[in-house]
Amino acid sequence: MQQDDDPRSEKQMEFVTLVAGGQSFCIEITQIREIRRWSPVTLLPHSPAYVLGVINLRGAVIPILDLAAKLGFSTITPTERHVIIITAIEERIVGLLVESVSEILGAQTDMVRETPKTEEDATTRAVDGIIPVGDNMIKIINLDALLQSSLATAA
């Protein structure tokens, strides 16, 4: 009989690494539907600064958020060099504007470090953990926590 319950066997996870606000982040690959070039959005009146507008993606109206601004960094002025990551959490589909997408990062669960506890704020809740890679600290985005307040505001 094969034993898969070995406590020493760590779960392998895959992330898409990205840059937002000049910082390195990653999102679990299973939460990403597609990655596309920046395209102009339709503005929504009275939206928060991080809600850039909406796009029509194959018949679906998708809100586009500036990830850097949502995380408390300076807003991005979109150019053709920027990228939109279309994410899916449960039934929610949202586009995130980022500066760039780098690579796919494979990591064992034991590589993930706990996010240091500071004042409870949106940024702290939005980061699930940190993966040290060389001199770089890649923050894992908790899309569920990040999008919870954003979608209520954008709707």
Locations of regions flagged by a protein language model:
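An acidic, low-aromatic, low-complexity terminal/linker signal
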Residues: 1-155
